[in-house]
Amino acid sequence: MFGKLTLSAVPYHEPIVMVTLAVVALLGLGVVGAITYYRKWTYLWTEWLTSVDHKKIGVMYIVVALVMLVRGFADAIMMRGQLALAEGANHGYLPPEHYDQIFTAHGVIMIIFMAMPFMTGLMNLAVPLQIGARDVAFPFLNSLSFWLLVVSAMLVNVSLGLGEFARTGWVAYPPLSELAYSPGVGVDYYIWALQISGMGTLLTGINFLVTVFKMRTPGMKLMQMPIFTWTCTFANILIVASFPILTAALGLLSLDRYLDMHFFTNELGGNAMMYINLFWAWGHPEVYILILPAFGIFSEVTATFAGKRMFGYKSMVWASAAITFLGFTVWLHHFFTMGSGGDVNGFFGVATMLISIPTGVKLFNWLFTIYKGRLRFSTPILWTLGFMVTFTIGGMTGVLLAIPGADFLLHNSLFLIAHFHNTIIGGAVFGYLAGFAFWFPKAFGFTLDEKWGKRSFWCWLVGFYMAFMPLYILGFMGMTRRLNHYDNPLWKPYLVVAFFGAVLIFCGIACQLIQLFVSVRNRKQLADVNGDPWEGRTLEWATSSPPPFYNFAELPKVQDVDAFHDMKKAGTAYRKLPAYQPIHMPKNTAAGFSIAVFAFVFGFAAIWHIWWLMAVGFVGMIGSFIVRSYNQDVDYYVQPEEIEKIESARFQQLAKQV
């Protein structure tokens, strides 16, 4: 009746896992108890969990990202600790099978369940406001996308206490991910978590492309959109083009595992190299899906804190377009050693090097924007300056790896690991943390505490260099990745330094949590009264902080890129309208939540081969969608009286500051 699920699926013999489960259970009970004690369940359900407001969905995305950052970093510091100890006769504290699961979970969580939701959350928060829209094109799909992410993240975490996670590495190459070598449920957890979250991401990409192309405010031409909106648009083009490839690759792997087919097994006509091609045809665009919005954040932050118009706006747009196109032409550099031949390797090596040109254009444009600007050294600009140095190093090592001959020497070594983290942490993560500090007051109405923000930045920056620069050296010394034990005593000092670097990054994360606590405690002193704490230049700063649920009482008229800056110069930024018109808005819905719950049931049942429960989940998903499709009560009009009340309260608040 319960398929492969038995009591033996609970890892009683793993003390680390059981202690972790106990801690998580206690924290969960504490949260549930607090919500119950303060009687907030109704508020959470009506205002947040069923909301289709893009701003609230953005906040929830970021909450999930921060939770998964803690989970993914816990895996990282455990690996660093293991490698600092496991030399010679000392085998460390993690058994190999547990280490391999942590190794896989870290990559999957940090890329799919931390970086992606962080990026999507910031995109939800800022893009509709930046283009003067009242919401996204498909508010219900936005809610559904979020809840699909949540349930897929839950599947990854459920694997901690029921069964196991994949031991394949985050790429899950065959034949290791095939049934013969991974007969347990770990790879199935991997497949269904990525399939469900990938569907949500694809819906997000479609949603935001339609939003940007069809819902810009009157007068805003494409070449008048903020750079962040542009980079998110290019990222969404990559999402729509690449995520179906991942869906297909994992679908074929599922057929191999569930129906004994042979797409990726060498016997009976299969080819493991086809999976590797398909995976990286998605995987390399995924890197640019993560980095392009971060580039947009750095552009917004640089222009704002330098007090200048962005240098080379058009070249920034075209550079983003070039990166988007070239990002689809370089996937083979992930497996130069697979035997494609010198001509093929040479083509992809040159294409990889070419990406450094538009990236360099962006870097010089940021520097020229800062040049002769009156730079204010708040936390967002510190993350930006840290990125410029760190990402440049990562880019140079990437150009080195683009040379096939050098890659043959360094492939699969820790040099590659250092390069990847150099670009993703130094680029994407630093960008998201800059955006988090930058747009936090817009979401919550008060700024983050600067003192703790700067402490976090310095811990992250110094910790990053301590954690990953030694890995470049270890790569040259011949240390390969995926090791849980080694015999070379010369490697140990570098791995110990890397461990202490990870500890410093932990201090940075702790400082961010303290920063949140201190900021909430001191929110009255840190209040953003006029909605423009940074002297912003784009339309999101024209609203109150947080913005009203309809965003704009009247859609703004735009003539140029820095629309809000122009309004302030013209004296029209804070103009109260004599009368208001009704505003068309979507109603909240629980349909996204219910469809995602059934998707979780479907995925869990598929993992454990509980076929009747899988049918329940499938019928529930389809049924919920049909019910939603026939529901005509999905929108309403905000009446002028309500708008007048909200806007009058805002202008009274502004008048007190004059």
From Swiss-Prot:
Location(s) in or outside the cell: Cell inner membrane
Periplasmic compartment segments: 1-14, 78-101, 157-189, 254-277, 337-346, 402-423, 478-493, 616-658
Binding site for Cu(2+): H284, H333, H334
Catalysed reactions, as listed in the record: 2 a ubiquinol + O2 + n H(+)(in) = 2 a ubiquinone + 2 H2O + n H(+)(out)
Root EC class: translocase
GO MF, one annotated term: metal ion binding
Biological processes per GO annotation: aerobic respiration; electron transport coupled proton transport; respiratory electron transport chain
Annotated disulfide bonds: none
Domain of life from the UniProt record: Bacteria
CDD domains, per the entry: Ubiquinol_Oxidase_I (cd01662)
Record note on quaternary structure: The cytochrome bo(3) ubiquinol oxidase complex is a heterooctamer of two A chains, two B chains, two C chains and two D chains.
Note: Ubiquinol oxidase catalyzes the terminal step in the electron transport chain.
Protein name (database record): Cytochrome bo(3) ubiquinol oxidase subunit 1
